[in-house]
Regions:
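Serine-hydrolase catalytic machinery in alpha/beta-hydrolase-like enzymes
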Residues: 1-24
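Short, proline-enriched alpha-helix->beta-strand connector loops that line the catalytic pocket
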Residues: 23, 65-71, 97-100
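Gly/Ala-rich beta-loop-alpha elbow adjacent to hydrolase catalytic centers
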Residues: 28-37
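A conserved short beta-strand
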Residues: 45-57, 70
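Conserved serine/cysteine hydrolase catalytic core
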Residues: 59-70, 78-80, 135-138
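Short beta-strand/loop motif that positions the catalytic acidic residue
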Residues: 73-75, 106
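Conserved alpha/beta-hydrolase "acid-adjacent" motif
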Residues: 80-90
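C-terminal catalytic histidine-bearing segment of alpha/beta-hydrolase fold enzymes
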Residues: 100-140
Length: 140
């Protein structure tokens, strides 16, 4: 999709999608969906947190991580996109910058491991991810 419309358009569509929603949200994205989710978490007033799955941008992409904003990042250790394209390094730096940050690196090399419709689905990793995300949501 990003190749067809461009990553800027993906972000713009994500931002437009939440225009009429209340401010107090936790923003979540999977893979390419992390682009708008992370931007909204870092720039939309009233954000309550962020859950970034299988991708992460440097916090500086949107002016630094907001003080006190919880963030959770999940990905697999050898995912060619998450680990191989710099997202894991960006996630480590972001979590180090955040007051309330958690990076969960799951074993394996699968991308989109939470999508049960794909061969890359990993039920055990998805169960762990779900538990951690629910804990975060209960806190915010």
């Amino acid at each position: 999709m990003a190749e067809e419309v461009g990553s800027g358009e993906v972000v713009a569509r994500g931002v437009r999608a939440v225009e009429d929603l209340p401010a107090g949200l936790v923003y979540a994205g999977v893979s390419l969906g992390v682009l708008p989710a992370q931007r909204l978490a870092q720039t939309r007033p009233g954000a309550r947190g962020a859950v970034l799955l299988e991708a992460c941008l440097p916090a500086a992409a949107h002016g630094g991580w907001p003080a006190g904003l919880p963030v959770q990042v999940h990905g697999t250790a050898a995912d060619p996109f998450f680990a191989g394209e710099g997202d894991l390094d960006a996630a480590r730096a972001l979590v180090a910058e955040a007051d309330d940050g958690e990076l969960v690196v799951h074993p394996g090399d699968r991308h989109l491991f939470t999508d049960r419709s794909l061969p890359s689905y990993d039920a055990a990793a998805t169960a762990l991810l779900t538990g951690r995300v629910l804990e975060l949501l209960a806190r915010v």
